[in-house]
Amino acid sequence: MVGRRALIVLAHSERTSFNYAMKEAAAAALKKKGWEVVESDLYAMNFNPIISRKDITGKLKDPANFQYPAESVLAYKEGHLSPDIVAEQKKLEAADLVIFQFPLQWFGVPAILKGWFERVFIGEFAYTYAAMYDKGPFRSKKAVLSITTGGSGSMYSLQGIHGDMNVILWPIQSGILHFCGFQVLEPQLTYSIGHTPADARIQILEGWKKRLENIWDETPLYFAPSSLFDLNFQAGFLMKKEVQDEEKNKKFGLSVGHHLGKSIPTDNQIKARK
């Protein structure tokens, strides 16, 4: 894929981990296909995940009543964000594809990655209320989550004790990535890695590399288009009445989050529509 650039964000502390092996496999596979690959190994970088006044290098607008969202937006516009944030934003700006490699921790992303999102995805850079979801700043970019779990796949099924993996993925894939415009590709889910034998691990790595050969051509996951909603505060950003009427008699809702009180479409956050 000549001319394409990928950013791999790794959130695991150990170089001997399977997450690190997945990151290495991804980098090798993409480079083999002609991609330029940049990495953010958050633990190796000792990335600071805590938002604070220190993220702004210039003069604060209201130091007596510090409000991070407002101050960080102003700092972004004026070029006064801390250098570590700016460096990550530049990586994002240059990337066509972003891969997030991490172990599922407490049904979400590791704290260091959550902090990366909070500090790097600054308002006006990553989102605005005038331009969000499929109109967001990153709408020309694609993203994929590559996740390992401790539990088995059955534990994250409809009948499993942990509940439906689609529901777990929604806040990350819709609430963070698609909110900023990303076209989100099917997640790479590696279940129960701690109980997976060596030969099976090799097969997983090879399958991951094979997938990455043509990942740019994959169909993204489905999210309800922003055109289905009245995008203003007066209307409450609610789904348009005519859309609600049209969907009323359908068996399934539109997505995990927009289920409209009906059954959730099967694997809405795991498989793309065919």
UniProtKB/Swiss-Prot annotation:
Coiled coil stretches, renumbered: none
Annotated keywords: Cytoplasm, FAD, Flavoprotein, Isopeptide bond, NAD, NADP, Oxidoreductase, Phosphoprotein, Ubl conjugation
Keyword Ubl conjugation: yes
GO cellular component, one term: cytosol
Residues engaged in binding substrate: A126, Y127, T128
Entry-annotated residues carrying Phosphoserine: S82
Annotated positions binding FAD: H12, F18, N19, Q67, L104, Q105, W106, F107, T148, T149, G150, G151, Y156, R201
Chain segments carrying region Important for apoenzyme conformational stability: 225-274
Record text on subunit structure and interactions: Homodimer. Interacts with PDLIM4 isoform 2; this interaction stabilizes PDLIM4 isoform 2 in response to oxidative stress and protects it from ubiquitin-independent degradation by the core 20S proteasome. Interacts with TP73 (via SAM domain); this interaction is NADH-dependent, stabilizes TP73 in response to oxidative stress and protects it from ubiquitin-independent degradation by the 20S proteasome. Interacts with TP53; this interaction is NADH-dependent, stabilizes TP53 in response to oxidative stress and protects it from ubiquitin-independent degradation by the 20S proteasome.
Name under which the protein is recorded: NAD(P)H dehydrogenase [quinone] 1
Organism encoding this protein: Homo sapiens
Organism classification: Eukaryota, Metazoa, Chordata, Craniata, Vertebrata
Gene: NQO1
